[in-house]
Amino acid sequence: MTTETLTQLEQHELFLRRHIGPGADQQQEMLNFVGAESLEDLTAQIVPGAILLNRDLAVGDSCGEAEGLAYIRKIADKNKVFKSYIGMGYHGTEVPSVIQRNVLENPGWYTAYTPYQPEIAQGRLEAILNFQQVSMDLTGLDLASSSLLDEATAAAEAMALSKRVSKAKKANIFFVADDVFPQTIDVIKTRAECFGFEVVVGPAEEAVNYELFGALFQYTNRVGQICDHTELFAKLHEKKALVSVAADIMSLVVLKSPGSMGADVVLGNSQRFGVPMGFGGPHAAFFVTRDEYKRSLPGRIIGVSQDTRGNRALRMAMQTREQHIRREKANSNICTAQVLLANMASFYAVFHGPQGLKVIAERIHRLTDIVAAALTAKGVELVNNTWFDTLSIKGLDVTAVQARALATGLNLRIDSDGVIGVSLSETTTRSDVAELFDVLLGEGHGQDAAALDAAIIANGSSSIPSELVRKDAILTHPTFNRYQSETEMMRYIKRLENKDLALNHSMISLGSCTMKLNAATEMAPITWPEFGNMHPFCPQDQAQGYAQLLEELSTWLVDITGYDAVSLQPNSGAQGEYAGLLAIKQYHESRGDAHRNICLIPQSAHGTNPASAQLAGMKIVVTACDKAGNIDMADLKAKAAEVADNLSCIMVTYPSTHGVYEETIGEICEVIHQHGGQVYLDGANMNAQVGLTSPGFIGADVSHLNLHKTFAIPHGGGGPGMGPIGVKKHLAPFLSGHSVVKHGLESDNNGAVSAAPFGSAGILPITWMYIKLLGKKGLRQSTQVALLNANYVMKKLSAHYPVLYTGRNDRVAHECIIDLRPLKEASGVTEMDIAKRLNDYGFHAPTMSFPVAGTLMIEPTESESKVELDRFIEAMVSIRGEIAKVEAGEWPVDNNPLHNAPHTLADIMDPAFDSRPYSREEAVFPTNAVKANKFWPTVNRIDDVYGDRNLMCSCAPVSDYE
């Protein structure tokens, strides 16, 4: 029998061994190879001593998975899941089990990355294309994005687009109807202030009284009224203004489309298409506009192109609009969006089909009609005389009604003027309606739902005017009409999944992206109703579980970052950057330094940095990097001194985007502070800091954290993400506030950057679990193994490829850059060829041509075992051998396995393959490891130029299905 203690047998650190890829023996092998005695020795060799923490993190010890689940179950049980009739953009919905089990809970969908490598992402690209088709069909417009972060930020993007394309060039007013959701108005005002736009909020009909570049209307509006604004929109067009409409996606199934009324932009939340409320998110916003505005559209667009065999293939289209290319000139700073949730919404539409959606929408409307009939029968006055799912009621005893509602376990919308709102949803049942009668009318009301239903059938309903009833067909494409059985739906989802490479197949070593394990135990709580079915505007005493989770998580993040306060509102890394820069901007303004508007940004920075600075109303001054990849201190000092009077901040990433710990980071902070500026430290590379150092300890003032990188939230194929920010004490009063939910903080009345007060709160249990399970020791060791894995890969590959940058002791941080430019010059083989060839080896390519063109940036993360690292290294070494054959003239530059990659089954079945100078086995089974676990790309290399010149962003023609 064992002599181990009971504590040892309880295995409180078992999850640490599950999360970290290489076991102790593998770690020691790698340490021996790189020339370090231990993880501590390696850490001392890599991290500058001046910034190395000399304390443990105050996040507690690690715990077992069952123990962690028990902890968070107790927290979840503190949430009271009331039936919600609050509405305001968030509704109850039924998540089809076939979608929950096969998409939301499936690592084949949630661990994939943004489809920059489209040849190995055709499945989710098709699902996103379906989302775009749903968006276009329902809104009546031509071109949709693949998702935005939420309805409110989408509305802010609509404002920005309107300004870009409006021909009313001298106009500076954006009009917002006063019946738009308050959280949307809040976010618009925040964004407008940075742009210098004037926002006018007033009755919809007053929009024509202003010289404006754009206007926003809600359809149906906040009180539930369905307004036909066709004539108003025409008048606004005469003034050269653009018209945007925030629309309810479910209502559009049965209502006249905003596009047919003349809207130029239609946006909204797709949440009620099968995505839980999640206390505010994550949800995918849809954004649709006219084809003529395609180059001004924010966010990703999925388009149809063709591959080298002429077959239809999907890709991200018109990327030259985006931040990673256009930087401060980009349409938006949007990067990660909400692809996983967009996929869920698109599958919801596919599963139900147009007829199923119509039945759901009509049932919601019928139940609303029944409630309205009961109220009017008792002489109760309604604010609105048309409706889809929302009634606004006046004249009732608010106190009595609210007391009955809470006692019954349901939430109503209570307006400040005494109006009571009731918004019904897909989850509302006949018995719920009877319960509503009792709550709204009290005892003895005598109303019967069945009798009222019969009367409505006999007499008809006028709550949707005939001219506003949708008469055109929607979702006629075969995709939306053939998968209504669960068997077919399950197989369709599986067919798409099989086309994609995700973490459940192999390592995704994308530099600056941190594709680590998203453990099943961490993911489990997000599907619990206690987290998923909470409305973000519910009474705070019902959300005590969320309150505890958010408080504990904030406390942990404060300790990990070395800051004094945290805001959890930003729902992406880009939004976190924006929120952090806003805090800096408002801090300067509070000191009478509003003129401080210059942001210094190193030339190596990620494109979101300048895009976010521009969004915050700042001017960008670029600082140089030296030959070693570090910030050029002489240039930095000169430029900081030159702009000292107007210096707002610097945005710097640490470790640098070149993959090294810069020794001068402390001096950089000092220089900026000496000239009155603030230091924004981008948290993209936080996976190399946790437990070893921290932004606050280094000397920074504010950072955002990518919870979808460092803290285990999955990338979801392009979202969801979370970008909370940490700040020093002096910036805390300038964190984001919220117009609907107050928490008694100094920052409550500040503008919002997201629709919900805690952004995508529904996925925060993942990060809570990650920190709880790993504890202080596990978090630190995870960082150390990330460094070990990166240095192991770097040293192994350095014998075959030049490594571009190293830091002290010729070490890298958590990622390394290999320089392909000399090979390209010698052989003609490009970085694109190598990236696509890796697909044949079963790998997603590392980050290509960032931060330096002609390079690959590799970040293996701590979750990858030595076995997987060696398989990747073997692939890269094998590819180097293939390049050598091209260099030697054995293979032509334009006809070799790299140039023709990736290879498909169609390639090797083609008799014409015999004319190639390499064998079929060399093409698709280049190593024995590939034979054991082959991933087959389903298309050949895609023609990007063709796709942009022949832009098509909707489902394939029906003829393709015949």
Swiss-Prot record:
**Enzyme Commission number(s) of this protein:** 1.4.4.2
Its catalytic activity? N(6)-[(R)-lipoyl]-L-lysyl-[glycine-cleavage complex H protein] + glycine + H(+) = N(6)-[(R)-S(8)-aminomethyldihydrolipoyl]-L-lysyl-[glycine-cleavage complex H protein] + CO2
Keyword match Oxidoreductase = yes
TM annotation in the entry? none
Give the record's GO biological process terms.
glycine decarboxylation via glycine cleavage system
At the top of the EC hierarchy, this enzyme's class is oxidoreductase
Is Lipid biosynthesis given among the entry's keywords? no
Taxonomy, superkingdom = Bacteria
Keywords per UniProt: Oxidoreductase, Pyridoxal phosphate
Cellular component annotations (GO), alphabetically ordered: cytosol; glycine cleavage complex
N6-(pyridoxal phosphate)lysine: residues carrying this PTM = K709
Cofactor(s) this protein requires: pyridoxal 5'-phosphate
GO molecular function terms listed in the Swiss-Prot or TrEMBL record: glycine binding; glycine dehydrogenase (decarboxylating) activity; pyridoxal phosphate binding
Name the HAMAP family for this protein: GcvP
Summarize subunit and interaction data from the UniProt record for this chain. The glycine cleavage system is composed of four proteins: P, T, L and H.
Q: What family is this?
A: Belongs to the GcvP family.
Q: Matching NCBIfam families, A to Z?
A: gcvP, PRK04366.1
- Tell me the function of this protein: The glycine cleavage system catalyzes the degradation of glycine. The P protein binds the alpha-amino group of glycine through its pyridoxal phosphate cofactor; CO(2) is released and the remaining methylamine moiety is then transferred to the lipoamide cofactor of the H protein.
This protein is called Glycine dehydrogenase (decarboxylating)
Q: Which organism is it from?
A: Shewanella pealeana (strain ATCC 700345 / ANG-SQ1)
